[in-house]
Design a protein with these regions (language model features):
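Acidic/His- and Gly-rich active-site-bordering loop/insert found
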Residues: 2-115, 121, 130-140
Length: 141
């Protein structure tokens, strides 16, 4: 029996869809519904591959995730990759698709955050997960 192993593209698309399906609308007053949930999703994705992420809240519900990948050369300055999980609120009536469904149409993902910046978050997360699975270390932290 053959086992399906997802490709790197499959993983990026899946992570991006998962993130798009979490409503992380930022209304500017701390009442956004899902930033903490999205951060917990990221924590789980990193923990699943043996990494030790940390979660910090700057305010209730406003969560940030930090993980450090030790580099091969500690003498080199560190490189920071970062993204944000919150999105501008979306009114469903202004959309031809559910803005929080992570729908795929004609090879494109649709949803609030698909281009700012849950797509890049998914790519970074996928690459970091792959590096952890393979035991690869970046050149620098």
């Amino acid at each position: 029996r053959s086992v399906h192993h997802p490709t790197a593209e499959d993983e990026v698309v899946g992570i991006c869809q998962d993130l798009l399906r979490i409503d992380t609308s930022n209304y500017g007053d701390g009442r956004g519904p899902g930033e903490r949930a999205a951060a917990e999703y990221v924590m789980g994705a990193l923990t699943e591959v043996g990494l030790e992420p940390e979660l910090f809240e700057s305010a209730p519900g406003r969560a940030n995730v930090v993980v450090r990948l030790p580099g091969a050369d500690a003498a080199r300055p560190a490189l920071v990759l970062h993204g944000h999980l919150d999105v501008v609120p979306a009114a469903a009536e202004d959309w031809s698709v559910d803005p929080f469904a992570g729908e795929e149409r004609a090879g494109l993902l649709w949803g609030r955050g698909a281009v700012d910046m849950k797509d890049m978050d998914a790519m970074i997360l996928s690459v970091v997960r792959q590096m952890a699975r393979e035991g690869r270390r970046p050149a620098r932290d």
